[in-house]
Amino acid sequence: MTTLLAAGWPVLITALVLGYACGAIPFGLILTKFAGLGDVRTIGSGNIGATNVLRTGRKGLAAATLLCDALKGTLPVLAASHWGEGPALAAGLGAFLGHLFPVWLGFKGGKGVATFIGVLLALSPVTLAAFAAIWLGLAFALKYSSLAALAASAATPLILWALGHGAVAALFLVLAALLWWKHAPNIRRLAAGTEGRIGKKG
C-alpha cells in the first residue's frame, strides 16, 4: 500500500482525473454521428458501445469503436505508469469510470468491456491473453457474448492474484463488479433464456 501511495495524493488524483477525461470520450456516439448515422443512443439497446454500433450495420465503424474504447483504457494507464504503479492503477480506474459514467452524457455510458480490456492490456498482457481465451471459448461454445464477457471478467482478478499481482487484482475486482452491475439487464435475460445469441438475427 505504501508503494502504491508513494507518488503522493496530488499525482494519484491527477492520474484519476486524466484517466476519467479520456474514458469519458464517447467514441461510439462521435463516430456514428461523424458517419452520418445520427445518435446511436436511439437504436438497439441505446448503448454507446461497439455492440450497439454494430446494430447500425457498419462493421468497420463498430470495430473502430471497439478499438477506440479499448485504447482510452490503455493509453492513460501507460502514460501514468511513468509516475509509478499507483498512478497507473488510478488512471485505469478513472478511464473505466469515465466510460461507464461520462459527465458529457449525463453519466450514462457504455458497459465497459472494451475499456476493461484496454486497461488490462496496459497492466497485464498475459492476463489479457487468458481473458481472451475464456471469452472466445465460451462465446464459441455457448453463443452468448455477454455470458462470455461476464465469465472472463470474473476470472480476471483471480488470474491476476494467482500471478502475484495483488494490487492489480484488487483493481480488477472493482472493475469486474462494476461491469457485472452494468450488465444487469443481460444477466436477467440470460436467466430468462431471452438473451440474444451470437449470429442469431431477430
From Swiss-Prot:
<keyword id="KW-1003">Cell membrane</keyword>
<dbReference type="Pfam" id="PF02660">
    <property type="entry name" value="G3P_acyltransf"/>
</dbReference>
<keyword id="KW-0472">Membrane</keyword>
<keyword id="KW-0443">Lipid metabolism</keyword>
<feature type="transmembrane region" description="Helical">
    <location>
        <begin position="87"/>
        <end position="107"/>
    </location>
</feature>
<dbReference type="GO" id="GO:0043772">
    <property type="term" value="F:acyl-phosphate glycerol-3-phosphate acyltransferase activity"/>
</dbReference>
<feature type="transmembrane region" description="Helical">
    <location>
        <begin position="116"/>
        <end position="136"/>
    </location>
</feature>
<keyword id="KW-0594">Phospholipid biosynthesis</keyword>
<feature type="transmembrane region" description="Helical">
    <location>
        <begin position="158"/>
        <end position="178"/>
    </location>
</feature>
<dbReference type="GO" id="GO:0005886">
    <property type="term" value="C:plasma membrane"/>
</dbReference>
<protein>
    <recommendedName>
        <fullName>Glycerol-3-phosphate acyltransferase</fullName>
        <ecNumber>2.3.1.275</ecNumber>
    </recommendedName>
</protein>
<comment type="subunit">
    <text>Probably interacts with PlsX.</text>
</comment>
<keyword id="KW-0444">Lipid biosynthesis</keyword>
<comment type="function">
    <text>Catalyzes the transfer of an acyl group from acyl-phosphate (acyl-PO(4)) to glycerol-3-phosphate (G3P) to form lysophosphatidic acid (LPA). This enzyme utilizes acyl-phosphate as fatty acyl donor, but not acyl-CoA or acyl-ACP.</text>
</comment>
<feature type="transmembrane region" description="Helical">
    <location>
        <begin position="11"/>
        <end position="31"/>
    </location>
</feature>
<comment type="pathway">
    <text>Lipid metabolism; phospholipid metabolism.</text>
</comment>
<dbReference type="InterPro" id="IPR003811">
    <property type="entry name" value="G3P_acylTferase_PlsY"/>
</dbReference>
<keyword id="KW-0808">Transferase</keyword>
<keyword id="KW-1133">Transmembrane helix</keyword>
<dbReference type="GO" id="GO:0008654">
    <property type="term" value="P:phospholipid biosynthetic process"/>
</dbReference>
<keyword id="KW-0997">Cell inner membrane</keyword>
<keyword id="KW-0812">Transmembrane</keyword>
<comment type="similarity">
    <text>Belongs to the PlsY family.</text>
</comment>
<keyword id="KW-1208">Phospholipid metabolism</keyword>
